[in-house]
A protein has these predicted regions:
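Catalytic glutamate of the conserved HExxH
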Residues: 39, 43, 47
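Zinc-dependent metallohydrolase catalytic domains
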Residues: 2-35, 47-233
């Protein structure tokens, strides 16, 4: 599996990950940026999560943040923790449908580092995809939100899906999984990663471009009010 090594200040990806659903040399950029791109971004994000942020650029454990930065980081991560604390995996919600009070929830504090990585990874990959479109069109890179959105809008439509839609569909596809109920409950207790569906739905609902991609509005299942959406970086 891919990983980040804080003391060495490096990230690692085994060659075996460079295959579908993460990467396909025959696929278009949207699919690959939504797949391996988000994974690469995830590992970069670990450098600035609740643990990685304690190490400096040389891999030394050092307090290098300002008090203001720490306070803002704490505020944003707390909001993300609270979001995930409210999640119950759908298979367990179904299992405990007769008594929802017994349904186990995601542990937002346990999974915060991985959730920060996932959220950062998607946003990094979206920006990288936009820059790839800019390069192909001979446009200068512009990292502003407005320019990113404009660049992504130039992606070709394929099989009836826009570039943005293909990006998010690819991201969702890399987390497809199926577990027994017993294992799903065990993972909630010990795994620092959120359940696969939460790594998908819990993340994209915080990304403004997801709403534009699928025309999500208030009242839709995936809707999260703009003021409640979290952006760590």
């Amino acid at each position: 599996a891919s990983d980040v090594y804080k003391r060495q200040n490096e990230i690692m990806f085994p060659a075996a990950i460079l295959q579908p659903p993460f990467f396909n040399p025959q696929a278009d950029d949207a699919a690959n940026y939504g797949g391996i791109g988000a994974v690469i971004g995830h590992e970069i994000g670990h450098g600035f999560d609740d643990q990685g942020s304690q190490y400096d650029g040389d891999g030394a454990l050092r307090d290098w943040w300002t008090a203001e930065d720490k306070a803002n980081f704490k505020k944003r991560t707390t909001a993300l923790i609270e979001q995930y604390n409210a999640f119950v995996p759908s298979q367990l919600a179904e299992k405990y449908a007769d008594d929802p009070s017994k349904a186990p929830h995601v542990n937002g504090a346990l999974t915060i580092g991985e959730n920060i990585g996932d959220l950062g990874g998607v946003n990094i990959a979206l920006k990288a995809y936009a820059f790839a479109l800019d390069k192909a069109a001979g446009r200068p890179e512009d990292g502003s939100p407005e320019a990113i959105e404009a660049s992504l809008a130039t992606a070709p439509v394929m099989d009836g899906f826009t570039g943005l839609q293909r990006f998010f569909l690819s991201y969702a596809s890399i987390w497809r999984s199926k577990n027994r109920d017993e294992l799903a409950e065990q993972f909630l207790q010990i795994d620092p990663h959120s359940p696969a569906e939460c790594r998908t739905n819990g993340i994209v609902r915080n990304v403004d471009l997801f709403y534009k991609a699928f025309d999500v509005h208030e009242g839709d299942t995936m809707w999260l009010a703009p003021e409640a959406r979290v952006a760590i970086w």
